[in-house]
């Protein structure tokens, strides 16, 4: 099983959620890449405490995300920072050659989204994905099917509400 070494930028709730999810992936038996968290970054060093307990073998703790991006052994980054920072931080991650698992929105407006897309165009080796997608959720599969078939016509806007259980 291949291991993908991750760094996390943003150690608040969403960073902890992602980290917790990686611990649940270890039971999968298929040919899947296993995530390993080796570095964390947050402006508040007190947020490292939870990660140190959950991941006692962490190699890196940074308060400046540029230091995390400079680590050659970090292959991918999960980023959970305030929306207004997405364009700059996501672009820096991509330009550093790191795979990106980000949160929506990918830019606060079209210009910011275009900047992120430009970084991706310049780094085709980088895999980038939104962590908040539901591509395998049955309702989403149906909508994807309808969109691909043309049944919905041109899609210009979507809004999805999921029931809470």
Language-model features: locations:
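Local beta-strand N-terminus motif with an aromatic residue
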Residues: 37, 58, 74, 152-155
